[in-house]
Amino acid sequence: MDKSKRLFRKSKRSFRRRLPPIGSGDRIDYRNMSLISQFISEQGKILSRRVNRLTLKQQRLITIAIKQARILSSLPFLNNEKQFEKTESIPRTTGPRTRNK
């Protein structure tokens, strides 16, 4: 093979298939909090199917289970885990007020 053509060939990378996040024995249910919590973001939002690497049917079942858990108060609708750090409050100094007429 010509040296100039060798530069444009793609290198062979090993392909490793990722394991599916839901096994065949896992039941998608609103009571299975350990499974449901994997598919929720830090803000409490349901992650997309592309991020989760789920099939369409699995994503639908996960979404329904999360919504049921929220309605039954097992899961919060919003996750306020991030507490805002309190910064030192700077007292406002207002000078003497003058009226402009």
Curated annotation (Swiss-Prot):
Basic residues bias locations: 1-19
InterPro entries xrefs: Ribosomal_bS18 (IPR001648), Ribosomal_bS18_CS (IPR018275), Ribosomal_bS18_sf (IPR036870)
Pfam families, per the entry: Ribosomal_S18
One of the GO BP terms on file: translation
Entries under Gene3D superfamilies matching the protein: Ribosomal protein S18
GO MF: small ribosomal subunit rRNA binding; structural constituent of ribosome
Gene Ontology CC annotations of this record: chloroplast; mitochondrial small ribosomal subunit
Region (Disordered): 1-23
Family: Belongs to the bacterial ribosomal protein bS18 family.
HAMAP family for this protein: Ribosomal_bS18 (MF_00270)
Record's subunit section: Part of the 30S ribosomal subunit.
Name under which the protein is recorded: Small ribosomal subunit protein bS18c
Organism the protein comes from: Liriodendron tulipifera (Tuliptree)
